[in-house]
Curated annotation (Swiss-Prot):
Residues 4-79 form the Carrier domain. Gene3D superfamilies: ACP-like. This is Acyl carrier protein. InterPro entries: ACP, ACP-like_sf, PP-bd_ACP. It is found in: Cytoplasm. The lineage of its organism: Bacteria, Pseudomonadati, Spirochaetota, Spirochaetia, Spirochaetales. Signal peptide: none annotated. It comes from Borreliella burgdorferi (strain ATCC 35210 / DSM 4680 / CIP 102532 / B31) (Borrelia burgdorferi). The gene is acpP. Disulfide bonds: none annotated.
Length: 80
């Protein structure tokens, strides 16, 4: 799975969960500042991402996610 495929899947999940248009979401989009996600939104997003990519996201790693690109890079590393 390459970065574009991962980003597309992540963007789709974020778009649906946060009710944002996909073209508003970039790898530089910040969850809180740009996408207006609150802590519950982020928790739900993490759950959906874990389900979609069949992988557990450790809490210490999740706390480091500021942008959509951070999530894409994390998943890319895990999926090799």
């Amino acid at each position: 799975m390459d970065n574009d495929e991962i980003f597309s899947k992540v963007r789709s999940i974020i778009s649906e969960q946060l009710d944002k248009k996909e073209d508003e979401i970039t790898t530089d989009s910040r969850f809180v500042e740009d996408l207006n996600a609150d802590s519950l939104d982020i928790y739900e997003l993490l759950y959906l991402l874990e389900e979609a990519f069949d992988d557990k996201i450790p809490e210490n790693e999740a706390n480091e996610f500021e942008t959509v690109g951070d999530v894409v890079n994390f998943i890319k590393k895990r999926k090799g």
